[in-house]
């Protein structure tokens, strides 16, 4: 069996509120679909966050429906699990994934497929918040039990798992039962390693969603995994990275004429207008402004002499607010996990009062 593992397309996302960046997201996704149609795998496994929002723009819905309809018409079976970005927040709400039900199987449970006379067990479930950890662990135990008689078995999840994401995780790596392949989503960088006698894989996002993903993109690329599961056991050598090109990001540190010329050369080497970030010494801002027609957007900060050589310790765009909240709470003698849970509840319009009541009853009433 040949299958594709893909995740985290975030259709509808508008980085810097730019039409061009929204289009980049769509173009990257469409290029992935084009490559999948050329490859003609038996199955596509999508590990969540197809959409960036519970209510994506009409264009995002149209592009997704057209893409999965094409896969369906070419007899390519698609399984998908819901990510945190497309999960309903209240009773009565539906995920936008429901609109794709004629073309994909939205997985919250198990399925067994037969490819060339061989049975493959596939199971998975939607994103679970950390507060639903016990429910998630019960599901994993059930999956493990149901899969025990199958040699080839795949688990699909959209979760943060420690240590692959050190703070904002919902599961520990030792929570995962033994499977042949772990088709994971949620973390935007590519991760591929042997684990539990199988292969653990985060396919990563298909575009640069946050600026701090650019360095990983240069090292590991963006796209999806193509997995050859025709042998009895899976090895990392059976997995191929299928890469696509993303818009380039250029870091600058302009403090003199030499560094300005270096920045110009970097920008002119780009295939399309890049996103620029970094630092520009104030006196060189007029120089840099002459390049505005060659860049998509300038996110570099203007600094005075005394700050030009200071290290960039804080990247506002990628700043981990959650980490700061937990660190501050712990230093104040407050339960950091509680603060983080409250932050998430407020962010997602969830019932924070119920969360506090549950915490109080558990902590003080046993």
Swiss-Prot record:
GO BP annotations listed: DNA repair; double-strand break repair
Enzyme class of the recorded protein, top EC level: hydrolase
| Cofactor(s) needed | Mn(2+)
What residues sit in the active site?
85 (proton donor)
* Residues that, per the record, bind Mn(2+) 1: 8, 10, 49, 188
Binding annotation for Mn(2+) 2: 49, 84, 158, 186
The entry's free-text remark on the cofactor is:
Binds 2 manganese ions per subunit.
Free-text activity regulation comment from the record: Nuclease activity is regulated by Rad50.
InterPro entries noted in UniProt: Calcineurin-like_PHP_ApaH (IPR004843), DNA_Repair-Maintenance_Comp (IPR050535), Metallo-depent_PP-like (IPR029052), Mre11_archaea-type (IPR032885), Mre11_C_arc (IPR055244), Mre11_N (IPR041796)
What GO MF terms are annotated?
A: 3'-5' exonuclease activity; DNA binding; DNA end binding; DNA exonuclease activity; endonuclease activity; identical protein binding; manganese ion binding; Y-form DNA binding
Annotated keywords: DNA damage, DNA repair, Endonuclease, Exonuclease, Hydrolase, Manganese, Metal-binding, Nuclease
UniProt-listed Gene3D superfamilies: 3.30.160.600, 3.60.21.10, Mre11, C-terminal domain-like (6.10.10.50)
- Enzyme Commission (EC) number: 3.1.-.-
Q: Which domain of life is it from?
A: Archaea
Q: What does this protein do?
A: Part of the Rad50/Mre11 complex, which is involved in the early steps of DNA double-strand break (DSB) repair. The complex may facilitate opening of the processed DNA ends to aid in the recruitment of HerA and NurA. Mre11 binds to DSB ends and has both double-stranded 3'-5' exonuclease activity and single-stranded endonuclease activity.
Quaternary arrangement and interactors, per the entry?
Homodimer. Forms a heterotetramer composed of two Mre11 subunits and two Rad50 subunits.
Q: What family does the Swiss-Prot or TrEMBL record give for this protein?
A: Belongs to the MRE11/RAD32 family.
Q: What is the official name of this protein in its record?
A: DNA double-strand break repair protein Mre11
